[in-house]
Amino acid sequence: MQSSADPDFRQVPAAITIRHAVRVRSPDIFMRILSLACALALGITSFTSSAATAPTAAKVPGSEAIVSKTLPNGLQIIVWPDHDIPNANFYTFYKVGSRNEYPGITGLAHFFEHMMFNGTSRRAPGEFDRIMEASGGSNNASTSNDRTVYTDWFPSSALETIFDLEADRIAHLAFDDKVIESERGVVYSERRSSVDNQPFGSLIEQMQATAFTAHPYQFPTIGYPSDIERWTKADLQQFFKTYYAPNNAVLVIAGDVQPAQVFAMADKYLAPIARQPAPREITTIEPEQHGERRLLLERPDAQTPIVAFAYHSGTNEGGKDTPALALLNTILAQGVSSRLHQRLVEKEQAAVDAGAFVENGYNPGLLWVYAALPPGGDSAKAEAMLDDELAKLVRDGVSNAEMEKARNLKLSAFWRGMATINGKAQALGDYQTFYGDYKKLFDAPAAYAAVTAADVQALAQKILRKSNRTVGWVVPTPQATARKEANP
């Protein structure tokens, strides 16, 4: 859900870079699951990492060269020329995710990550990748509750080749029966590895389904097993026609390109693709929660207990509380000096990892707080510590020093993103899709500076209520625990 405003809002650990190396295309939520699993295995103690002090300058060099254009078919294009190195990228943001699904077709948005690389009426399955790699490029894709994003990186000399490839798969995607069945099996296997056979993945899925009772954020991005088994070709074709339309997409290109060159190629390759009727709007509003919800998963494959709290955030991405929520999350969880790490990991040694992350999107999402216990850890003690630490923040607020550190971390993340063409493309797409205007990206430093300690405390008081949360535990089954104790 949350692909935030600032490029570092969802702190991405080093382990996740494996995704690009091995070409794993997975929903965003499962990348966090992977990172937690790696943290437990390797002794890493946080999803987040400290950053250097941010520069005070707010003007991004080169931003004055950004040019945008909307084609007659509704495709929005943003170009940020950056000639430091002879590379460019091609980021396509489709406004479709699991929030656009319903029982019977859950997981379709993610399924298209696979289909989009498996042939067109002009090209065989796998040819997209072969041509791109022969041109010196690489690619990836990701699906969240709100969007599906396709990312290409390549030498700028290959720009027209990329335009041809991308236009072809939008205009002429193949729906071959054998490919559909093959990829259905791949996705089902992916679900087993990231959810069904992953205790934390199962916990996250069931907590989302418990926290959201009306809004489609309750559906897992990967899809439910029975739906994965039963999608029809007609389902796929209708979904693609509805959501993979130029008027439902934003294209961002950053790097060693000229806007006139980009727009000429867009007119040649993308403008002929017909717009489609606007997708049905999601108007459902999740009812206010009036009592704590709890669930317990007992799993024989759970190595250690894990607890998570999921609080309704009360704000969509780009809402007025977004900067304050980002700073609250940072104070709670970013770095070894953060409140949760210091209390549960360093001081009390009640957890091997403790942290938080935010999932917001077009609609209000969740603030997640979690702790992973050591083998044999005291679950009641760990939950009580989390409650106590959150209650302190609500009651006493945050210090000026914490605010300064949090602002510096967010600003430093902002400027790191602005230092690369991929960071620029991601941020422009995030702001255009979630905020409605990419120019608001450059207001981010001032937005963080404007948040006060009182703002953060007021937001904490608003959302960190037991009646506003779902609590979930995943623990080893008693039989599994007994076996471990008998065979240490």
Residue ranges and their predicted role:
Residues M1-M31:
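N-terminal secretory signal peptides that target proteins for export/translocation
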Residues R32-A39:
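Sec-dependent signal peptide recognition
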Residues A41-I78, Q258-E298, I306, D443-P488:
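Proteolytic maturation boundary segments
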Residues T53-V67, D168, E190, S194, ...:
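Histidine-acidic residue clusters that define the catalytic metal-binding segment
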Residues W80, I85-P103, G107-F111, P125-I170, ...:
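M16 family metallopeptidases and their MPP-like homologs
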Residues L108-M116, L328:
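Active-site His/Glu-centered metal-binding helix of metallohydrolases
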Residues N118-R123, I170-K178, V398-S399:
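Short, polar/flexible loop-turn hinges at active-site or ligand-entry regions and domain interfaces
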Residues R192, A209, A278-S337:
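His/Glu-based metal-binding/catalytic segments typifying zinc-dependent metallopeptidases
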